Amino acid sequence: PMGAIGFIGISYLSFRAIQIIIEIYDGSIKSIKPLDMIYFILFFPSLSSGPIDRSRRFEEEINTAIPRQVYIDEYLLPGFKKIAMGLLYKFAIATVLHMFWVSKVKPDVGILPIINYMYAYTLYLFFDFAGYSYLAVGTSYIFGVHAPDNFDKPFLSKDMKEFWTRWHISLSRWFGDYLFSRFVLDSMRKKRFKKRA
């Protein structure tokens, strides 16, 4: 298990490092402050499972003085609320779902057991992962960093496209900004997609 956790942490570290390299390459990052970059890449609250922040936004925030009352109202109190929500999701709801639903599903081959397990595990995965994300974001707030939220009521989505934009938001936006959009723009410049006659 620790090996898997370590691998996940390395993957999120890689997302941050790749983002910096891409933005240096395309000129979005004009100057580099090594200590700020290292702090961004190794920022511990969100290191193991996100959310994936953006280096320029992160650097701007850590270098901006926060007035005491603003910190209390916009960072400290919201941070504790998010941590409380994370504890509720991860250690109460997810635990109950696993103990009394996921672990009780019989490993029978059949459509009903499969559907039952699918719903049980999906809900468990959401509350477990969203709970961790709330803990990470809340801790980030307390450290003076408005880390992005990772979930936005995904089960209220009208279709799979909307679901993808509400589930693990920071990861889907990362892929959109640093892989998909760049691939499309590069393909248009090189005319990879030719119009059919």
Regions found by a protein language model. Give the residues of each.
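Membrane-embedded transmembrane alpha-helical bundles that form the catalytic cores
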Residues: P1-A197
